[in-house]
Amino acid sequence: MKGDIIISPLSTEKTALMAEKENKLTLMVRRDANREMIKKEVEERFGVKVEGINVMITKKGKKAIVKLAKEYSAEEIAERIGVF
């Protein structure tokens, strides 16, 4: 499988609240990506530890909600990648 797993970060009011209160990032990912691929990509690209991943397929594509370990800040990562 060639190319990046992560297509883009998702930026809405709800995702901003999730980043702030629940320490979660919301990302659009390739449709053929699985949880292990997403976890590896997030940990390597952003230098964080992932606690869990929820994945859902929507009309707009595959969405991954990634819960980060307590020692990392989802808000800080989101600011660094230009979501907020």
Curated annotation (Swiss-Prot):
<keyword id="KW-0694">RNA-binding</keyword>
<dbReference type="InterPro" id="IPR013025">
    <property type="entry name" value="Ribosomal_uL23-like"/>
</dbReference>
<dbReference type="Pfam" id="PF00276">
    <property type="entry name" value="Ribosomal_L23"/>
</dbReference>
<comment type="function">
    <text>Binds to 23S rRNA. One of the proteins that surrounds the polypeptide exit tunnel on the outside of the ribosome.</text>
</comment>
<comment type="subunit">
    <text>Part of the 50S ribosomal subunit. Contacts protein L29.</text>
</comment>
<dbReference type="InterPro" id="IPR001014">
    <property type="entry name" value="Ribosomal_uL23_CS"/>
</dbReference>
<dbReference type="GO" id="GO:0005840">
    <property type="term" value="C:ribosome"/>
</dbReference>
<dbReference type="InterPro" id="IPR019985">
    <property type="entry name" value="Ribosomal_uL23"/>
</dbReference>
<protein>
    <recommendedName>
        <fullName>Large ribosomal subunit protein uL23</fullName>
    </recommendedName>
</protein>
<dbReference type="GO" id="GO:0003735">
    <property type="term" value="F:structural constituent of ribosome"/>
</dbReference>
<comment type="similarity">
    <text>Belongs to the universal ribosomal protein uL23 family.</text>
</comment>
<dbReference type="InterPro" id="IPR012678">
    <property type="entry name" value="Ribosomal_uL23/eL15/eS24_sf"/>
</dbReference>
<dbReference type="InterPro" id="IPR012677">
    <property type="entry name" value="Nucleotide-bd_a/b_plait_sf"/>
</dbReference>
<dbReference type="GO" id="GO:0019843">
    <property type="term" value="F:rRNA binding"/>
</dbReference>
<keyword id="KW-0687">Ribonucleoprotein</keyword>
<keyword id="KW-0689">Ribosomal protein</keyword>
<dbReference type="GO" id="GO:1990904">
    <property type="term" value="C:ribonucleoprotein complex"/>
</dbReference>
<keyword id="KW-0699">rRNA-binding</keyword>
<dbReference type="GO" id="GO:0006412">
    <property type="term" value="P:translation"/>
</dbReference>
